[in-house]
Amino acid sequence: MTKRSEAKYKIDRRMGQNIWGRPKSPVNRREYGPGQHGQRRKGKLSDFGVQLRAKQKLKGYYANISERQFHGIYVEASRLKGDTGENLIGLLERRLDAVVYRAKFVSTIFAARQFINHGHIKVNGRKVNISSYQLKVGDVVEVKEASKQLAHVLEASQLPERDTPDYLDVDHGKMTAKYIRIPGLSDVPFPVQMEPHLVVEFYSR
């Protein structure tokens, strides 16, 4: 198991949930957290603890975004019209790494970030190597021609545990994904329950 995989599964263990729905997640085999004290019975969380956990889970899901970056996304969401929690999800799903993952061009969101950073992705015909790049409705994401035959790309497109959401128009033959609309919470195929309203409560304290 690579260091990247270990870090990813450590998030699963800390949350006590298989947050990406992966068959190899260690929480499929046990119900306690990482470390020598992981098997201790957990007490009831305070309201703050519940809110913090919701934030950590959402941050972790999107490749463990840094606190500074995640808080910046929250601030932007709070300035938009409408529900801040829904806006937060919409902004997270506009990230290029999230779309590359949703389109099944790679098998994990961690791999999506690395794939973008290594220059394998174009947006509207131009190379973009910033994983946090914010897409707009109508943007077309594509895998570079020279990268389409990479083994992990071909494998990811066949993964059975993930369906592509309907806010993307994906062509796996051409390895393209058109961003059709900004989704809300109910549109996003999270394998576990995400609670952005608790994240809003955390930052509103």
UniProtKB/Swiss-Prot annotation:
InterPro entries reported in the protein's UniProt record: Ribosomal_uS4, Ribosomal_uS4_bac-type, Ribosomal_uS4_CS, Ribosomal_uS4_N, S4_RNA-bd, S4_RNA-bd_sf
Pfam family name, one: Ribosomal_S4
MF terms (GO), sorted A to Z: rRNA binding; structural constituent of ribosome
Gene Ontology BP annotations: ribosomal small subunit biogenesis; translation
Key words, A-Z: Ribonucleoprotein, Ribosomal protein, RNA-binding, rRNA-binding
Protein's name according to its UniProt entry: Small ribosomal subunit protein uS4
Subunit structure comment from the entry: Part of the 30S ribosomal subunit. Contacts protein S5. The interaction surface between S4 and S5 is involved in control of translational fidelity.
